[in-house]
Amino acid sequence: MSNQYNIDVDKLKEKAIEIYNEVYAPKFGDKYLQDFIDEVIKYCLNLLQNRELNNDSTQSEKLHDITVKNILSPTYNGKAIEALAQARTIGEFDPLSRIIKIQGINIFSPNSVKTIGVGTAKIFRYAVTAFTKLNHPNTPSNKIKLRVYLDLNDYAQANGQDITLSEKRRNFRRKIKNDLEKLKQAGVSGEEKIQGKPRRYVGLNYIGKYDIKGDSIMVEFTLGMAEYLVSLPMISYPRSLYSLSDNDANTFAMAEILCRQNSIDNNVLRGTHGRLRIETILKYLSFPTYDELQEKNNIRRWREYVKSPFENCLEKLYQCGFLKDYRYAHDGGGAELTDEEAANINSYGEFVSLILWYELNGFDDTATRAKAITEKRAEKMKKLTQARRKKKSNTDNQ
């Protein structure tokens, strides 16, 4: 690896090992150590290039913060998972059936819509990420590892919680237990396109069992949920999102949508992975629609009810380290709005028609990602071609 910034790579490796031993070694041993070191060096050189880290910062606490906060983890992602994050923002609860309806996904909740919140979505996402490490895509049913173990201290750190004091630790454990109980009781039904084919699922329980002993959290997925998970595509999920407040459902739902858009391979190849129409994002948030504003005679206060809270969400995502940059642009050519133009948007319609351009921390540049995707697809096609030729050769020789 080139080192045009005269950075002391050996000291950087030492710091990376120190961070790994503190955060990840208790769970994974040395299994991911070298991958972690490589990612830290690549990430820090990228920060140096963008002047976000000084050369003398390689031994500082800043390295610890940016590394742990922005670490990316591959995780399975589908509508049944995203629905948990959207239950508090756009979920419609039917008290008779005890079902939360979320854009074609139905979650049966034995109590009420308020039982499914950001904390519930976060612990499930955290468990799915651990499951992803154990089970590769399309793992046969009889080989799926259903049980994962999570570290209480690591999860607390990811959430930005200091649980050193015994009372705080008890409260944090109690909250996790409550969220896991909700997941055990909740069932999800819906239909989505997976690997190009429509797939329907009915009454899948999110988890089957859980247990918390000491600092270890055991989560066991049901076989049905596990089979669903290994059929899904993966996204790269930033650790920084766990630090968002459990009380801020809109910011969390926005982050998950931006993360999904950024992780789709075809979007990267088309160059659309870092932009979304504001109108599209608003469909997943609980801000009032145009019709709702008109109905309550509040259309003139659209900035107060929509634009300001929308921008507050963006700022929180920037502050937590998820967003590297964001800006508004006009549709089509993508001409960026100046600060003055952004401040003087005249109407609700004009605002929602804008495009949000954004960059996420921790990801390679577009060209590097596109090259990696193209090479991966070419390798996959090569293997498929070789397999077909081998099969044909065996048939011809019979």
Give names to the regions the model predicted.
Residues 1-398:
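Charged, alpha-helix-forming regions
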